[in-house]
């Protein structure tokens, strides 16, 4: 093996061993004693990892691998399976921080997790989105039911921007003309921002979305 190739492989092993900031988005059974985790990490995006032995009664991971709990995880791969999409969970510990959503606030929290699972590709880092997700969980934990909707809508917009789905909101999508103060516009799922004949309330809504 050439020296550069050996250096690259050594660097890859070092990167794999570095702790990652992570949240558990979802898990499902892998075997009688193990789980497959869907993780959202700050450094490497969405990943899948096998947590061997996590279902055993005395496993230290049972109280750690919980949704909405910020973790520090260490991942690896088997030596003969370097290209596998599913990683091995080498270790996980609670990272501390803000309170987790509980009770009725679990429902909007799981909604955020579902958005990330459906819209994020694997191994595609979005550190700013990770931070926005952590902030949204903090807000949900502190808010009552009336306060959930602003948190969810703000996160949806951030997610659409990060994934490149949200159109430019300062212009009419079809004509690329700038939005004019006092005019009314609507945001259509397939057409983007469109001029509207409705009242001025829609215009102010678009302005708030742009903000």
Feature names for model-found ranges:
Residues 1-35, 40-211:
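Non-catalytic alpha-helical scaffolds and adjoining flexible linkers that form interface surfaces
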């Amino acid at each position: 093996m050439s020296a550069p190739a050996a250096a690259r492989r050594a660097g890859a092993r070092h990167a794999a061993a570095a702790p990652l900031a992570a949240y558990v988005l979802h898990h499902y059974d892998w075997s009688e004693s193990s789980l497959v985790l869907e993780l959202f990490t700050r450094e490497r995006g969405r990943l899948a990892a096998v947590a061997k032995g996590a279902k055993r009664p005395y496993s230290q991971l049972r109280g750690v691998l919980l949704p909405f709990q910020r973790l520090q995880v260490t991942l690896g791969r088997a030596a003969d399976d370097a290209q596998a999409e599913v990683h091995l969970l080498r270790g996980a510990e609670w990272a501390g921080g803000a309170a987790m959503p509980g009770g009725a606030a679990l429902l909007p929290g799981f909604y955020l997790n579902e958005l990330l699972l459906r819209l994020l590709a694997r191994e595609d880092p979005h550190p700013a989105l990770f931070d926005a997700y952590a902030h949204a969980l903090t807000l949900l934990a502190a808010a009552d039911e009336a306060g959930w909707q602003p948190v969810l809508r703000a996160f949806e917009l951030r997610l659409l921007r990060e994934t490149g789905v949200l159109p430019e909101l300062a212009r009419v999508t079809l004509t690329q003309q700038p939005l004019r103060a006092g005019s009314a516009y609507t945001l259509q799922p397939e057409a983007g921002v469109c001029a509207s004949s409705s009242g001025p309330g829609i215009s102010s809504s678009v302005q708030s979305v742009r903000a």
